[in-house]
Every structure is written in C-alpha cells, then in structure tokens.
C-alpha cells in the first residue's frame, strides 16, 4: 500500500503502465489504491430497472472503486453454469471495471438444495445466499463442506428468520418512540454463533456480511482469538449513524438495520483492533417508488458506492478515529487479500481538501436512495484509473 501526492507520482517509476495525463493536476491531490467492494448488488440479470452492470460500474468508478463482487439475488439466480453464464456475458460486454460474481449457496437461494457449486466454482469469487440467511444447520454444513473441497469461501448473510417477528428497523429507542416493529440484535449474532460452530467442524474459510451489532463483534473477536478462519465486513452507515438518527424515510431502511450508539461504538472498536477486516457498501439500488414508502413500506437497501470514501474519510479519518492508511487497508487491501486478488495498476486521484454536500442527483447509479444525502463531506474524486487507464466518469 502506498499513498502519494501527485507531485510524488510524477517523479516515481512505480506506475510504468500508466497511459494517462496528470501533469495538469494540482500537486496536493492524493493518489490512493483503487477500492474493492466485496458486497454490491448490480441487479443484472432480472432487475435492470433498478441497476445494470454498466450503471453499477459507473457508480463504482465515481466512488474510486475498481473491483466489485456482485451478490447472487438475481433472476435467474446464478446457481448453475447456465444461469451464471447470463451474468458473465453481461459483465464481459460491459468491461469497465473488474466485476466478480458470487455463486449462490442454494438453488434459487431457497435454502433447500445446494447449487451446482462444483460447476460454477471456477467462475465465482465465493458462495453466498446474501439477502437471506441459510436457515437449516444441515444445509449450511453441507455447503461448507462442499466449499472447502473447492477451496472457496462461504460468505454469509447471518439472519435467523425465527427471531424477526415482523420487524423492519432496529429494536431500539427510535422504534419504541415511534411505534415501529423492531428487529432484535439476536437475529444476527445467533446465526453467527451457529455458523462459527460449523466452521470449526468443517474447516471452511468463512466471511460474515454486514455485521451491525456489538455482540457480533465480540463473537467474531473471540473466534479469531481461537484461530477460526473467519473475516467480516461492516458498512459505512453502521459506522456513522445510530437508530436515533433515523427518519421515517426509505433511504434509512436496509437489512440489517442501523442499530444503537452502543453498537456503533463497538463496530468502530472492531475496526480499530482488526476484528472487522473490511468495509463494504452493500450497494443495493431500488426504484424511486420502491423507496418512497417510509420505513415500514420501503424495500431494504441503499446505494453507497459513490459516498463510501468521503463519508468514512470525513467521519473517521479527519476526526482522528483511524488513519488514512487504516482506511485504505479496509477498503482496498484487506478485501483483495482475503479473496485472493491483486491490486494491479489500479488507483484513484482524490482532492481530500474539497468540501461539498452529497446530492443524490449527482450519482451515476440508477438508485438515488442514500441516508447520506445532504451531508457535508471532504474528499472529492478527480480520476479513477484501472490497469493504468483513466476511466471516464
């Protein structure tokens, strides 16, 4: 990892494959590694009215990302080579950035029968049923054994459906004050506990999606201390907001929900001590109509690729919570390391001093629903570079 200013960039021999022109850029712009997001929803095939691989890639470029991993809640679900090829062909046709698909754990993400894991393994980054937790202990154990035999990770959306009770936001102060049904923290951490037992039994490499609770941090920290091969991610929104920041607006609805201040502080501590390995956006665009029905009626999911770095830089780095180097580890280095990718000649040029207000009208994504709209941030993207080539943004 290296962070350079433009004037240093101009004199180094490290970037031999760079074919762009930066001589006119200000010397105090920073050159950062291209980010890697292991958790995005690009909606193609099946839901192109929400997002396409092309619009999602443009959104990623506009946030300094050069590699993304796309979740399998598509139509058709990539549970067979035939279905996966539809997505692979669309990715190849776009070709803007590195887009790597997940294969599903189960057929149709229904949790009842394993996908054609062996057939699709060579073409996917890992296996996940993100959007749904695998409810059956036996099914998850079978999936872990199969993934281990294929040297692939299981990437788990941890959610025990039996504990949801119709909830749609965190079961905390805001829910109680405003008569909303809450989702308890146990719905997340109880399934993490179950999965860790299965990981110990099977020896699979295991990664937990979007952790949001203090208990999840504590459980994963303990598992790491015991030598379990486990990594995890959290999202920018869980590090910046607590449930008292909620508004009855669909742009504050996602799964898992924004939780308490105690949870937020525990997540930050997990970032600082290495329990949490990476930050992923869970970029999940929907149409305006699908996000315009308040907290109760809107679909889960927010967009995040274009706001992640400025939000985190402003709220964590400029405030002294973590260093810029640590943030780069979380957004660029650790994700690639865990999933066996290399950085190559990918980087982005940032004006870290620029202050501006986030406006969803500026997003390249088809989705415009963001809890960060209206916030003032520092860190404006100037250029994104993939394999030494400046990308149009």
Write out the residue ranges for each language-model feature.
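Active-site mouth loops of central-metabolism enzymes
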Residues: 38-51, 74, 100-113, 131, ...
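C-terminal cap of metal-dependent C-N hydrolases
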Residues: 9, 294-297, 318, 345-393
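Metal-associated gating/positioning segment near the N- to mid-region
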Residues: 29-94
